[in-house]
């Protein structure tokens, strides 16, 4: 149930049905490199392109009813440093220097280098609920398969490892 697991293969659909990223790519082939807000409703990119601010949609919620907040964005970024997190993701997001909370629904991304793709890359970071996965003593790699709480349009109705998974809206 962990979309970033190093053990096994994530369940089909889990990454984009149960979990969400701040932005989603256009499904239209005529809009390459275009993204639209899923968890954010406004983006501010600095003129020098070294910082960016996301305004988090105040209506965004996780499947357990908790709101999606800046704390979840910061927590998700910090997961990239967890030794149990997937090393490919660490490499992919390495040029994002920091993610800092400005307010409950506003976060600032600071980039380590100038790279025109970094604003798009930030939009692809899966946002995990801090109140679920950030509990003291929880292991991102070991405890994740007990529960999958995400902000996506679906929840898991039932599953059996290696056999089936059923989603409900």
Which residue stretches match the model-derived regions?
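N-terminal lobe/hinge region of extracytoplasmic solute-binding protein
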Residues: 1-47, 78, 149
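Short, solvent-exposed loop/turn elements at domain surfaces
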Residues: 1-4, 30-33, 63, 117-120, ...
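Gly/Pro-rich hinge or "lid" segments in bacterial periplasmic/extracellular proteins
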Residues: 26-30, 124-169
